[in-house]
Amino acid sequence: MNLPDTLLPCQRPRERLLRLGAPLLNDAELLALCLRTGRHGCNALELAQRLLTRHGGLRGIFALSAQELCTEPGLGVAKACSLLVAPELSRRSIEETLLGRQAMKHPEEVRRYCLTALAHQPVEHCIALYLDQQLQLLACGELERGTLGRASVFPREVVREALRLHAGAIILAHNHPSGNPQPSAADCAFTQQLSQALALVDIRLVDHIIVARDQALSMAERGLI
């Protein structure tokens, strides 16, 4: 990992990972393990710390596009690819855990999935979790990028995909890049519009979760559905 000789073996991220486990490593150490190597005059741990400082933490780094990562000093294509796949692997792992399980019996896992999928996004994204009649997860999918509900065709697309999957219910989720989890008037209006469109084909909108950084707000729990 191009770490300096002054760093004792027991202090190196790889050795600490094997000895202590990932939860006890700090962000810079975990990021250094993803990067594997540093650059000239800068070891992997130092490069990781510089990235965290420059972008305000992991969320800022994972919000970068492929092009932005590739142009970061000291990264290049290989390191950029390692960083691009990390949050996606986490999201897919949680999705596999949820598949076939009753979503409403595992609300914390649903929130964790939504946070993993959306918290790092720099612009609004919307995803849907399609459930069967027993509220078991059938599939997850991305629906929209940009301001929620801007396109009038959007509710029809949700209904069409739900029918294709033979879904009986849906959980919707989108993010607020501003960091404010409170639903806007537009969020509430769109939620009602989608709920009514789904009801026409006997599909229930179970919840609409708003993700804002490390928060996940349930509109159903607020009585807004």
Curated annotation (Swiss-Prot):
Domain annotation MPN: ranges: 103-225
GO molecular function, one term: metal ion binding
One Pfam entry name: RadC
KW Metal-binding (keyword) present: yes
InterPro entries the record matches: MPN, RadC_JAB, RuvA_2-like, UPF0758, UPF0758_CS, UPF0758_N
Domain of life: Bacteria
Keywords: Hydrolase, Metal-binding, Metalloprotease, Protease, Zinc
UniProt-annotated binding residues for Zn(2+): 174, 176, 187
Coiled coil (UniProt feature): none
GO biological process terms on file: proteolysis
Keyword match Hydrolase: yes
Motif (JAMM motif): 174-187
Protein family per UniProt: Belongs to the UPF0758 family.
Protein's name according to its UniProt entry: UPF0758 protein BAV2405
Source organism: Bordetella avium (strain 197N)
Lineage of source species: Bacteria, Pseudomonadati, Pseudomonadota, Betaproteobacteria, Burkholderiales
